[in-house]
Amino acid sequence: SNELNVKLRSPINEILPHLESMNYKLPAENDQAAGTSPYTRKAPYHYGWDWGPCFVTSGIWQEVELFGWNSWFIKNIFIRQEKCDKDRADLTLEVDIESKNNKSGKIIIFEPKSEIFYEHPIKFSKGENKLYFDLVVVKPELWWPAGHGDQPLYDFQVTIHADGEEEKFSKRTGLRDVTINRVKDEKGESFTIYVNGKPIFAKGANWIPAD
């Protein structure tokens, strides 16, 4: 049988030796834990807030999955939106593959809502590989922030056949255009978020979890 051990280290104690060797410090006004918060990927309120205590914890907070593979597998897929409007969405699909040997096969890309179906022969080599494919969605259903419209999603499904093996990977995403308009004026410079050509007020609240 196999035994899987998970070691959890202190976010503060792990960073402190690095802080001592650096000749500069990053700002951490609310940090009650020796100024380590800018160097860890944790919510700032973990390090103390105006009414919140300093509890810098570590733990497993999502499901754990043990993944096994033989000669190759799909590590991930990414969808980059090059251009998107109500008439057309130009996308680049990146497929990351890791392999123990050089392989050849075919890839099938399918998205049911847009009826995209793409099949093409591929080759990948030993080690990490990145494959890129250009896709077009005609008349896309645009994604909007809450209160401004619907949030339709597209499911991109990738299937690869190589040397008698089959691997599948899917990614769900919304299609939208997001830009930040920065125009100099008499007070400085604007910072307006536009989604699908519409200015959006980015509202929020300065609140940390009560529990």
Question: Across the structure, where does each feature detected by a protein language model lie?
Answer:
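Secreted/periplasmic carbohydrate-active enzymes, especially glycoside hydrolases
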Residues: 1-211
